[in-house]
């Protein structure tokens, strides 16, 4: 696959291709670092190109309490994805329970976006989900640990 300026790549770092010359490819990282890769390294190793296909899936994982109605949480997520103007209607976003974890139910939301809208949607969804979960009484739990205390035999003997 060929590279073009503005493609977004990931190897050890993620960045946008700014320039390609005979000897190296220049990437700019998201925290504004210029990274120069020798072209031999880019062509001889696996590289993920996030932009060449035009659209990208945003995988958002949310945890809810076991005491929360999971259907309500999924409805809230659907209303958020339906309302966001940058989320594509096709492929249709998927919202699924992906794990029954120790302290929470994990729900994953899979909306599709244009590649250039990925980070905008990512941050928008996190903010909207926090607001809507709070508004709808959907609890995002803390990790929980049950502790059981046992009295030792010596303690029991001194009380006799």
Residue ranges and their predicted role:
Residues 1-5, 9:
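Single conserved hydrophobic/aromatic residue that forms the stacking wall/gate
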Residues 14-18:
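Short beta-strand-centered aromatic/proline hotspots
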Residues 21, 31, 41-43, 51, ...:
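A generic structural motif
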Residues 25-29, 37:
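SH3/SH3-like beta-barrel fold
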Residues 46:
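Anionic-ligand binding region
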Residues 50, 68, 78, 88-160:
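Solvent-exposed, non-transmembrane regulatory segments of membrane-associated proteins
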Residues 51-86, 141:
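A membrane-cytosol interface segment of integral membrane proteins
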């Amino acid at each position: 696959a060929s590279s073009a300026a503005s493609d977004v790549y990931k190897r050890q770092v993620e960045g946008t291709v700014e320039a390609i010359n005979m000897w190296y490819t220049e990437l700019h990282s998201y925290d504004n670092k210029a990274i120069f890769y020798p072209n031999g390294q880019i062509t001889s190793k696996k590289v993920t190109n996030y932009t060449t296909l035009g659209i990208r899936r945003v995988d958002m994982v949310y945890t809810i309490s076991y005491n929360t109605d999971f259907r309500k949480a999924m409805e809230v997520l659907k209303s958020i994805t339906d309302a966001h103007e940058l989320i594509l209607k096709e492929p249709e976003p998927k919202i699924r329970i992906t794990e029954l974890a120790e302290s929470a139910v994990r729900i994953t939301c899979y909306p599709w976006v244009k590649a250039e809208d990925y980070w905008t949607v990512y941050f928008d969804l996190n903010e909207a989900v926090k607001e809507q979960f709070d508004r709808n009484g959907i609890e995002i739990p803390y990790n929980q640990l049950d502790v059981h205390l046992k009295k030792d035999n010596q303690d029991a003997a001194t009380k006799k």
